[in-house]
Amino acid sequence: MTGTGEANGVAPAADNRNVFFFDIDNCLYPKSYKIHDHMSVLIDDYFQTHLGLSREDATMLHQRYYKDYGLAIEGLVRHHKVDPLEYNDKVDDALPLDDIIKPNPQLRKLLEDLDRKNFKPWLFTNAYINHAKRVIRLLGIEDLFEGVTYCDYAAPKLLCKPDPDMFAKAMREAGISDVSKCYYIDDSALNCIGGKAYGWKNTVHLVEPESKAPSQPACDHQISNLEELRTIFPEVFKSA
């Protein structure tokens, strides 16, 4: 990443550009990579081993915490005093990403075509910084973002999307104060609902063709492929 780098918790010097916030997992790479499935197995393993649960109970509690808090780790920290960095080592950092994620020239071209004079590309993820950096490095796009707002597992209180404070944190770190200048894409309906509720009207829900769309739209824009951003937000891209 260039410019402000991680910027976690630190507000950079403000500029007048809009900011385009990109989610990472199942957004910058497709769900067909099944990284979420790999992660779910590792999370269930962690619940089973560290909480002494049966596999069925581990899966149920994992899903409950994910639904209640947006991240399984938040439930573990709140209710079981788990060390989130140790959890990260056993789950996120243990994923075989090098065997799954490869450079994506089409994605790189899309990001290169952003009008950087008017738009600042920024990563916005519920993952820890280690995972975020691994993914964008393997995709071959680490030089195309100016910073990342992530869930800081080392912080006293875990903060993640769709908590409104997480959107406030992203704006602070990206150096922007006007919600009308925030563009955002995520594959999570809950996160898109949270973004729109926070005032990010230019929020886009990415729903791949093989995924089930929500019965009620999560926000004003829904696409099935990142390339569709060129059509719904032509102002974001450089003129031909």
Tell me what each language-model feature is.
Residues 1-17, 112-115, 119, 128-240:
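Asp-based, Mg2+/Mn2+-dependent phosphohydrolase catalytic module
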Residues 2-4, 8-22, 27-108, 116, ...:
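N-terminal helical cap/lid subdomain that shapes the substrate entry/recognition surface
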Residues 21-23, 124, 184-185:
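Generic enzyme active-site microenvironment
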Residues 33, 62-63, 100, 122-125, ...:
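A generic secondary-structure micro-motif detector
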Residues 48, 77, 97, 122, ...:
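Short, flexible active-site loop motifs that bind/organize anionic cofactors or intermediates
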Residues 95-98, 120-123, 186:
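Electropositive, surface-exposed helix/loop patches at the edges of structured domains
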